Amino acid sequence: MPIKPVGWICGQVLKNFSGRIEGIQKVIMDLIDEFKDEFPTILRLSQSNQKREPMQKPSKIRMAIALAKINRGTLIQGLNSISRSSKSVAKLLQPQLACRLLELRAISHRLLKEVNAPRQPLYNIQVRKGSLFEIISFPAKTALTSIMCASYAALIYLTVCVNAVLEKIMKIFQEEESIRQNREESENFRNAFSEPVLSEPLFPEGEIKAKPYRSLPEKPDSISDRPKLPANKLSNKIQVLHSVFDQSAEMNE
């Protein structure tokens, strides 16, 4: 695998992030504004887990409020692109770091062999000049390779930390979305039960007819003028009137 220089890697990273730097910078500045007051208190919290739990809840709430103000579509798209690019950078830097370590080990083995080799006679001074130059330049080479290895390791660690932060932010987004959906469902459920639904009538309006009220017949004035009936006929008339009243009462009920 050909070894790519660090400048080319940085160029590829900037090329992948071009067009999204402003949105990412805005998100980072919003997060810094939300959490800049809490950094001193977070650094002091190292005594017990009981003191840490109350501080994490408001910080999560503030993070959720800060992230809710940002456009979610662009933020999620930018986070996904950053995650993909960071993973690609980590995959690209891992073999280069291993190659540099192998080169350093080979140089150290060769130097040890040359140091432990038997001394050359005095007439072979020109051959020893090359080995002396390598001995003198070895500290510079080791320092340079160690700096490069440290920079590669720092970049890999940074990408891992960025991926962890992105995963936490995605989890917070998912929790907020689920809470919002549950709240909407509960509100819809309450509205459905608070507004009574009128059931359709069992009978159509055309078939329902009100029965006329039957009042008692008024006493005519001519009754007093009529002759009195015998007792038997009078009792029969009274029974007939009682039966009529009973039927009218049943019909009214």
UniProtKB/Swiss-Prot annotation:
Residues 210-228 have a biased composition (Basic and acidic residues). One of its GO terms (biological process) is spermatogenesis. Coiled coil: none annotated. The keyword DNA damage does not apply. Pfam families: SPATA9. GO terms for cellular component: membrane. Residues 210-231 are annotated as: Disordered. The keyword Transport does not apply. Keywords: Developmental protein, Differentiation, Membrane, Spermatogenesis, Transmembrane, Transmembrane helix. The chain crosses the membrane at residues 144-166. It is a single-pass membrane protein. It is found in: Membrane. It comes from the Eukaryota. Its main location: membrane. May play at role in testicular development/spermatogenesis and may be an important factor in male infertility. This is Spermatogenesis-associated protein 9. The lineage of its organism: Eukaryota, Metazoa, Chordata, Craniata, Vertebrata. The gene is SPATA9.
